[in-house]
Structure formats: structure tokens, C-alpha cells
């Protein structure tokens, strides 16, 4: 809210200076009147950007590629955590280990 009021004030001030110069006979455009509002808009937009953390998949650019991904509903699908983990054993392909804290019985899961 404060930035929008400041933007209106700067725009009005620049327009007043530009009109005053035109009355005095100067035909050159005021560069500050054009650049300053654009810089203010750019600053306002860049301040609205926030860092959002992922809650579903935990990805990393360094270290281990993928810490955990949810399992696939199909029996033949292999999540990426299987390829990143060295503890995966061949056995029943439809039952995979769950991450800690998700102790849901297999019979209650929907297909």
C-alpha cells in the first residue's frame, strides 16, 4: 500500500517536472520520469517473490538426488527413491517401505 502511494507521488512529480520543462521551451523528454517508475515497479514485483519449500518431494541439487518420493500406485512402477537407495531388495514389487511416521495398514489403503 505504501509503495503504491509512493509510486503515484513520484509519477505526479515527474509529470509536473516534465510539464514545467515543456512550458519553458525544452523539448527533450525527462529520462528520470520514465525510468524511476519502472524501477519502482520492478522493485515491488521482486519483493513479492517468496521462497516456497516443497512438502511432497524433497529434492536437492547437491548430495543425495532424492531423499524420498511417494510410492507409485501401480505394481510395476518404481519410485526414484528406489534408484537412489542402496538398501532396496528384490521381493514383492507391490509392497514398498513407507517413510517414517506413516503407519497405515495395507488393508485400509485404496487401490
From Swiss-Prot:
GO terms for cellular component: apoplast; plasma membrane. GO terms for biological process: response to bacterium; response to ethylene; response to jasmonic acid; response to salicylic acid. The keyword Mitochondrion does not apply. A motif (SxS motif essential for MIK2 binding) lies at residues 72-74. Residues 89-111 are annotated as: Disordered. Keywords: Apoplast, Cell membrane, Cleavage on pair of basic residues, Membrane, Secreted, Signal. GO terms for molecular function: LRR domain binding; receptor serine/threonine kinase binding. Residues 1-46 form the signal peptide. Mostly expressed in leaves, and, to a lower extent, in roots, stems, siliques, seeds and flowers. Induction: Induced by pathogenic bacteria Pseudomonas syringae pv. tomato (Pst) DC3000, jasmonate (MeJA), ethylene (ET) and salicylic acid (SA), mainly in shoots. Its main location: membrane. It is found in: Cell membrane; Secreted, Extracellular space, Apoplast. A motif (SCOOP motif) lies at residues 66-79. It comes from the Eukaryota. Interacts with MIK2 (via extracellular leucine-rich repeat domain); this interaction triggers the formation of complex between MIK2 and the BAK1/SERK3 and SERK4 coreceptors, and subsequent BAK1 activation by phosphorylation. Belongs to the serine rich endogenous peptide (SCOOP) phytocytokine family. Brassicaceae-specific phytocytokine (plant endogenous peptide released into the apoplast) perceived by MIK2 in a BAK1/SERK3 and SERK4 coreceptors-dependent manner, that modulates various physiological and antimicrobial processes including growth prevention and reactive oxygen species (ROS) response regulation. This is Secreted transmembrane peptide 5.
Amino acid at each position: 500500500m505504501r509503495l503504491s502511494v509512493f509510486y503515484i507521488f513520484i509519477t505526479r512529480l515527474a509529470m509536473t517536472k516534465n510539464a514545467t520543462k515543456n512550458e519553458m521551451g525544452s523539448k527533450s523528454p525527462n529520462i528520470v520520469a520514465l525510468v524511476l517508475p519502472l524501477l519502482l515497479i520492478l522493485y515491488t514485483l521482486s519483493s513479492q517473490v517468496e521462497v516456497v519449500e516443497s512438502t511432497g518431494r524433497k529434492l536437492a541439487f547437491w548430495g543425495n538426488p532424492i531423499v524420498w518420493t511417494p510410492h507409485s500406485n501401480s505394481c510395476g512402477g518404481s519410485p526414484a527413491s528406489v534408484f537412489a537407495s542402496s538398501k532396496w531388495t528384490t521381493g514383492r514389487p507391490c509392497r514398498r517401505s513407507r517413510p517414517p511416521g506413516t503407519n497405515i495398514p495395507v488393508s485400509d489403503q485404496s487401490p
